[in-house]
């Protein structure tokens, strides 16, 4: 965004470089970026459908339907799993661009850019952990509920 790109800071420089890393991925037809882009419509649909199927299955006592809802939650986990290396690669490319073009002059600037990009990457690690946790949580609700009824 212009607000980020026009700020005179190492953080802004690192964020812009990360986005340029995505542009490089796109220009080089980076396979995981293409895969992630292809998954977006499916993930949008299953993220909407999953909770509906899960709740309907629980309320109607049709547990196979609820399991289909849980399977829909798996779409978010797969998307997060694919997204993580895409984002790490964009950060790696961005940092390399900054170094190659002499935009990071001091050790502190290099460390600062690396810290910003690492912190950004950790948000994707957290998203993956959250998606897996959600999948396991709803799966355990169904799995535990089935054991009690048997």
Q: Which residue stretches match the model-derived regions?
A:
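Polar-ligand-bearing catalytic/cofactor-coordination segments
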Residues: 1-44, 78-150
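Hydrophobic transmembrane alpha-helical segments that form the core helix bundle
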Residues: 42-93
């Amino acid at each position: 965004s212009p607000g980020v790109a026009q700020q005179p800071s190492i953080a802004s420089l690192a964020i812009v470089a990360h986005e340029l890393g995505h542009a490089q991925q796109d220009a080089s037809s980076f396979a995981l970026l293409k895969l992630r882009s292809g998954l977006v419509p499916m993930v949008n649909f299953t993220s909407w459908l999953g909770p509906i199927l899960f709740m309907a299955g629980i309320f109607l006592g049709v547990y196979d339907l609820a399991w289909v809802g849980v399977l829909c939650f798996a779409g978010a986990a797969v998307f997060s799993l694919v997204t993580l290396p895409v984002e790490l690669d964009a950060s790696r490319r961005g940092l390399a661009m900054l170094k190659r073009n002499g935009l990071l002059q001091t050790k502190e600037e290099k460390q600062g850019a690396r810290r910003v990009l690492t912190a950004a990457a950790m948000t994707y690690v957290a998203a993956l952990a959250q998606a897996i946790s959600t999948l396991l949580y709803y799966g355990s609700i169904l799995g535990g509920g089935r054991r009690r009824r048997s």
